[in-house]
């Protein structure tokens, strides 16, 4: 089970975004203390902590990922970004999963075989493999 943490102030403003309320700077600051509180509340029910957004401050998202791996190593860490690529200031090795790509309505979401979005999983050797196809229904995949 994944705990998805929405991060507001999204600069991407993708047309058709299902979370357009996150375009504004709303909510509470996401701190290491807040992460600890989430872990205390949901820790036995989750296996992954996912940051949904954070494109306006990728350095902080990276720092929070490092914190989780150091202080809560039992959890995987994921980041869903609307950017085309991971910013150079982010160390991809601090994440177990990374989704990149803006939402483009006519291409569809991650579950569509025509999507531009990609989900990557870090392998044991540190390389990342594209696992997007796992979200597609078999009948949607061209053979």
Predicted regions and their residues:
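Residues that flank catalytic or metal-binding motifs in active/ligand-binding sites
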Residues: 1, 94, 115
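Canonical Radical SAM [4Fe-4S] cluster-binding loop centered on the CxxxCxxC motif
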Residues: 1-30
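Short, acidic Gly/Pro/Ser/Thr-rich loop/turn segments
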Residues: 12-15, 105, 127-128
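Core AdoMet radical
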Residues: 19-31, 44-59, 74-87, 97-122
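A short, N-terminal amphipathic alpha-helix
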Residues: 35-42
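Hydrophobic, Leu/Ile/Phe/Ala-enriched alpha-helical segments that form helix-helix packing faces
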Residues: 42, 68-72
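P-loop/Walker A phosphate-binding loop and immediately adjacent motor/lid segment at beta-alpha junctions
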Residues: 58-65, 69, 108-143
